[in-house]
Amino acid sequence: MAITQNYGTGRRKSSTARVFLRKGTGNITVNDRPLDEFFGRETARMIVRQPLELTKNTESFDIMVTASGGGTTGQAGAIRLGIARALVEYDETLKSELRKAGFMTRDAREVERKKVGLHKARRATQFSKR
């Protein structure tokens, strides 16, 4: 018998996360490492667990994640979106609850490009009156 699993893709900044949800005991592995080992910061771990805590599914699933690109904050946000999408694939009734909490919305903010003639995206050289 094939293992039933639910899948969700999440993106944030330049990070992408592929999330696989299986019935289990609440183990979360990111790139073959436990969640606590992969993310050093507690805030990143908290962000990843938010959809599960909201839907009271913390101990119901084993989650396997492949995260690539970007930094830790971007990857944590991508994983959160992926978990939320996978939960909706598992149970459609959770969608309104997750949407209300803002976990179903892709954060569209991206890094603004650097412009020619400026130091950074908006930082210009100091203005001299004389």
From Swiss-Prot:
Xref: SUPFAM superfamilies: Ribosomal protein S5 domain 2-like
Pfam families noted in UniProt: Ribosomal_S9
Gene Ontology annotations for the cellular component aspect, listed alphabetically: cytosolic small ribosomal subunit
Cited PROSITE patterns: RIBOSOMAL_S9 (PS00360)
GO molecular function term, any single one: RNA binding
Superkingdom to which the source organism belongs: Bacteria
One annotated GO biological process: translation
Keyword Ribosomal protein: yes
Cystine residue pairs: none
UniProt-listed InterPro entries: Ribosomal_Su5_D2-typ_SF (IPR020568), Ribosomal_uS9 (IPR000754), Ribosomal_uS9_bac/plastid (IPR023035), Ribosomal_uS9_CS (IPR020574), Ribsml_uS5_D2-typ_fold_subgr (IPR014721)
Keyword terms: Ribonucleoprotein, Ribosomal protein
Matches recorded under NCBIfam families: PRK00132.1
Entry similarity comment: Belongs to the universal ribosomal protein uS9 family.
Protein name as it appears in the record: Small ribosomal subunit protein uS9
Gene this chain is encoded by: rpsI
